[in-house]
Amino acid sequence: MDNNNHTFSSWLRSPAHHQWLALEGKRLLGFAKAAKLENGFGGLDDYGRLMVGATAGTMNTARMTHCFAMAHVQGIPGCAALIDHGIAALSGPLHDAEHGGWFSAALEDHGKTDKQAYLHAFVALAASSAVVAGRPAAQALLSDVIQVIQSRFWSDEEGAMRESFSQDWSDEEPYRGANSNMHSTEAFLALADVTGDAQWLDRALSIVERVIHQHAGANNFQVIEHFTSGWQPLPDYNRENPADGFRPFGTTPGHAFEWARLVLHLEAARRRAGRSNPDWLLDDARQLFANACRYGWDVDGAPGIVYTLDWQNKPVVRHRLHWTHCEAAAAAAALLQRTGEQQYEDWYRCFWEFNETLFIDIEHGSWRHELNERNEPSEDIWPGKPDLYHAYQATLLPVLPLAPSLASAMAGLD
């Protein structure tokens, strides 16, 4: 159970900190509204303008729809039309009407036609939050994405998600990814809440058991990202392209933080649903967090969390990405809620001090998305400021219980 009997002063109980988070969330939302395009939502530059040649991708559209839905549930006016715009895009130009599923972007915008589990997880998350927000057409989108996930991506045999297929589903990529399964875990927690079907919690546990307890547990709780279709690790994957934005070489401390939080959400969700939990969930979350801090934070002569590590836990890509630090703060908050231990309060404050000092851009809006190894603004991996999802969630998670999932928690749904 959550432990709120802290014997120390905690920012999680501070009304002033709650107010600061709320104001930062509203600031982020205000910046992101300019991302609207005909076919969904695109990427913004450093100054909040649509980037030159910006197109509406499924990932960004789904994430924005999810965020605006959460804001609407919070009671922030001005988001309803943006949710509906996202639903229309995900139900229209981003959707494959012939074969089912979702493209990476509309065909007229030259989107990739393969069907990726990663993108479908975000469509499911967006649809779930839009249903909680009570938006028209949200339920139809939710039913559609559930059918695709269950019939195409979910493998009962593997207890995990298949990675990707060709447009007509005839060819499958011989690869399994921890990243797509991580975001599927997040989506499954939301699906369990909006459908009332605890089967999604069993599926999420199956993923966590495979990716975290088995594979990461055997690797000192450093998350292995890349596998064959038979779930054999691929340690050299993308060695020649180590800074890939979605499939980088080595291990990614930011994902360890994200997994740590999701493991605790899963534990709380299953307890709330009356499902039994294995006794290793909390310990796995602790180990993930501890090793991400040990090997990722302040390891190259400057504060901040490096993007990637090699198999000897030495930095490879030393850039600091904003999403990594959002997830670090959110994971610290989750562990603090769960355990009541001061070490997590200390880390929580540490990460937010770093974020406020170096990532939050008061002058031009939103957050800088990337710093180099000297903690100077950089655009080597992520140009502009396209992302709302990570930073906005980082302002919400610390003030909400570990279960239910975000939109349902803000709506006060049991």
UniProtKB/Swiss-Prot annotation:
InterPro entries: 6-hairpin_glycosidase_sf, 6hp_glycosidase-like_sf, AGE/CE
Family in the record: Belongs to the N-acylglucosamine 2-epimerase family.
Short name of any one Pfam family annotated for the protein: GlcNAc_2-epim
Swiss-Prot/TrEMBL catalytic activity: D-mannose = D-fructose
Gene Ontology biological-process entries: carbohydrate metabolic process
Species name: Pseudomonas cannabina pv. alisalensis
Temperature note: Optimum temperature is 40 degrees Celsius. Thermostable up to 45 degrees Celsius.
GO molecular function terms listed in the Swiss-Prot or TrEMBL record: isomerase activity
Activity regulation description: Strongly inhibited by Ag(2+), Cu(2+) and cetyltrimethyl ammonium bromide (CTAB).
Quaternary structure, from the entry: Monomer.
Name of the molecule in the record: D-mannose isomerase
